[in-house]
C-alpha cells in the first residue's frame, strides 16, 4: 500500500493553474471551498441559474456555465452525479478541452466503464475523499482532514500524480493520508460497499431485525431503538477503535451473544449473494441496468423510494426522532 501524507506532497504543480469544479452538490461545494481557501484558483461550473448557482455565488465562488468554465480551466474536476456526467462532458466540456489539460474525478465510474473517453493528450486523474462533503468541509475547518484516494488513469503531461495529490492536499486529505489506487479498484469496491454493505446490506439487515421483533409482538418503538437507533453508537465505536475496540466497550453479554449468534444471520448464502453483487459490478450488468433506469427518468427508482417511505420502520422512526428531539429540519 502506497500512502501519501502532508510531507510527501506540495502544491507547486497547481501554481498558475485554474481548477474548474463542475457541480456544487455536497462534494462540489466542500472541495471547491477547501481548495479556494488553500490558495488554489477555483471556478465553479454550473447550469446557469440552476439551484446551486446562487448558493455558489453567496459562498463567494466565481461561477460560470459548464462551457465557460471548461474554456478557462487547466484542470476540470467533475463532481456531477454519475448519471449525468457523460452528457454534460460530451456536450458542454469536451469541445473546450485542450491538450495538456487534466480531467479529474472523485469517483471512477464514468472512466472505468468507458462512458467518458477523453483524448490521449490529456491527464485523467482521481482524488477521492472517503467521507461525505459535510465532513470534508468541517474537518478542513478544524485544521485536519479525512482520508482519501488518488489514482492516475492517464498521464499525458508527466506530472498528473503531482497535480492530483496537490488538489488532495488543498482539500485537506493528506493530513489524514491518501492511498494510491486505480480507477478500476476504486469504482468496483465503492459500488460493492454501497450495494452489499453500507446502503443495501445494512438497511436490509436493520429492517429484517425490526420486522422480526414487531412480528413477535414487541412494541415497534422498542424494536426501532434496539435494531436501528443504536446502530450509530456501534458504528461510531468501530470507526474510532475497530472491531476489537467495540467488543471491549460492549457488555460481556453483548459480546458473547454477538460472537456466538452472528453466523445465524450472515451465512455462506449471504456471502454467495455478495459475490453475485460483485460479479454484476465487474461484468457490467449493474452499469447497464443503471443506464436503462436513467433512460426511463428513473421511474423504477422513484417507485422504490416511495415504497421505502411507507415502510413501517420509516414511519416509526420519524415519529420517534421527532418525539426525542433528534430529527433535524431538512
From Swiss-Prot:
This is Ketol-acid reductoisomerase (NADP(+)). Residues 182-327 form the KARI C-terminal knotted domain. Mg(2+) 2 binds at residues 190, 226, 230. The active site is at residue 107. It catalyses: (2R)-2,3-dihydroxy-3-methylbutanoate + NADP(+) = (2S)-2-acetolactate + NADPH + H(+); (2R,3R)-2,3-dihydroxy-3-methylpentanoate + NADP(+) = (S)-2-ethyl-2-hydroxy-3-oxobutanoate + NADPH + H(+). NADP(+) binds at residues 24-27, 47, 52, 82-85, 133. It is an enzyme of class 1 (oxidoreductase). GO terms for biological process: isoleucine biosynthetic process; L-valine biosynthetic process. Substrate binds at residue 251. It comes from the Archaea. Mg(2+) 1 binds at residues 190, 194. Its cofactor is Mg(2+). Pathway: Amino-acid biosynthesis; L-isoleucine biosynthesis; L-isoleucine from 2-oxobutanoate: step 2/4; Amino-acid biosynthesis; L-valine biosynthesis; L-valine from pyruvate: step 2/4. InterPro entries: 6-PGluconate_DH-like_C_sf, KARI, KARI_C, KARI_N, KARI_prok, NAD(P)-bd_dom_sf. The keyword Isomerase does not apply. Binds 2 magnesium ions per subunit. Its EC number is 1.1.1.86.
